[in-house]
Curated annotation (Swiss-Prot):
It catalyses: a plastoquinone + NADH + (n+1) H(+)(in) = a plastoquinol + NAD(+) + n H(+)(out); a plastoquinone + NADPH + (n+1) H(+)(in) = a plastoquinol + NADP(+) + n H(+)(out). This is NAD(P)H-quinone oxidoreductase subunit L. NDH-1 can be composed of about 15 different subunits; different subcomplexes with different compositions have been identified which probably have different functions. InterPro entries: NADH-quinone_OxRdatse_su_L (IPR019654). It comes from Prochlorococcus marinus (strain MIT 9215). NDH-1 shuttles electrons from an unknown electron donor, via FMN and iron-sulfur (Fe-S) centers, to quinones in the respiratory and/or the photosynthetic chain. The immediate electron acceptor for the enzyme in this species is believed to be plastoquinone. Couples the redox reaction to proton translocation, and thus conserves the redox energy in a proton gradient. Cyanobacterial NDH-1 also plays a role in inorganic carbon-concentration.
């Protein structure tokens, strides 16, 4: 068991897991949450979301060119 903890492969897997969670999983969840709840959030929920946006800003920047959070139009135009 001790060789597992001293193994550089296990360390690499742990780093990949932490970085992918920080840069991919949580920012995508935040985008989903903000897109669905933006107009009905309470003040404390909005404050919490703003804090999470500040905390996970690098991951949100990675996805910002690909995701559109603008309101949907009425279809006329």
């Amino acid at each position: 068991m001790e060789t597992f903890f001293n193994n550089s492969f296990a360390t690499l897997i742990a780093y990949i897991g932490i970085i992918s969670t920080y840069l991919l999983v949580i920012p995508l969840f935040l985008f989903y949450w903000m897109n669905n709840r933006w107009n009905v959030m309470g003040k404390f929920e909005r404050l919490g979301i703003y804090g999470l946006v500040f905390l996970f800003f690098p991951g949100l920047i990675l996805f910002s060119p690909f995701l559109n959070l603008r309101p949907k139009g009425s279809g006329k135009g």
